[in-house]
Amino acid sequence: MELMVKGANALTVSETTFGREFNEALVHQVVVAYAAGARQGTRAQKTRSEVSGGGAKPWRQKGTGRARAGTIRSPIWRTGGVTFAAKPQDHSQKVNKKMYRGAMKSILSELVRQERLIVVENFSVEAPKTKALVAKLKELELNDVLIVTGEVDENLFLAARNLYKVDVRDVTGIDPVSLIAFDKVLMTAAAVKQVEEMLA
């Protein structure tokens, strides 16, 4: 199949990468797993046995008229432990390479179908100036966009750093979440070829 390249000849690409059916269940599973893996999972609270103190019985069992109590660190007491204390946990989910590649191909194919993937011969700015990048994006009628280049372009990265809803990444930096987070994805022809090789 062929992808239209703005201001250049069409680019021949693999149909298995850019023309496959959209597998919603697979994409959902991989995106959820990716987001889960980003969680810190470091929260921690103390149970009644971990809170310091509370060794002595606050008052005798009988004869005071008060409710019986065995420790001042009971969860129903102020400064007591937490009943079901949260503990650090690993939220990461296993995603096979085949599943990851399949999800990436599904997303890229859907971007092509929805005409949300724009391919250009090359994309750069001469100086790290946000104004220059805004002008370039205005020419292409883009404002909510992920820019994917073949290799890291520092000028482009610095120019986009202060723009809301604009992100610049090289091919190795893209993932399922970033591809679906933006309205449009702008890729250079070199990046398209690299993505194709990466997912082959």
UniProtKB/Swiss-Prot annotation:
Protein name in the entry: Large ribosomal subunit protein uL4
Ranges for region Disordered: 42-65
GO molecular function (one): structural constituent of ribosome
Subunit structure of this chain's protein: Part of the 50S ribosomal subunit.
Highest taxon of the lineage: Bacteria
Family recorded in the similarity comment: Belongs to the universal ribosomal protein uL4 family.
Matches recorded under Pfam families: Ribosomal_L4 (PF00573)
Biological role stated in the UniProt entry: One of the primary rRNA binding proteins, this protein initially binds near the 5'-end of the 23S rRNA. It is important during the early stages of 50S assembly. It makes multiple contacts with different domains of the 23S rRNA in the assembled 50S subunit and ribosome.
GO cellular component: ribonucleoprotein complex; ribosome
Signal peptide (residue range): none
Entry keyword set: Repressor, Ribonucleoprotein, Ribosomal protein, RNA-binding, rRNA-binding, Transcription, Transcription regulation, Transcription termination, Translation regulation
Biological process (GO), any one: DNA-templated transcription termination
Organism listed in the record: Vibrio cholerae serotype O1 (strain ATCC 39315 / El Tor Inaba N16961)
InterPro entries: Ribosomal_uL4 (IPR002136), Ribosomal_uL4-like (IPR013005), Ribosomal_uL4_dom_sf (IPR023574)
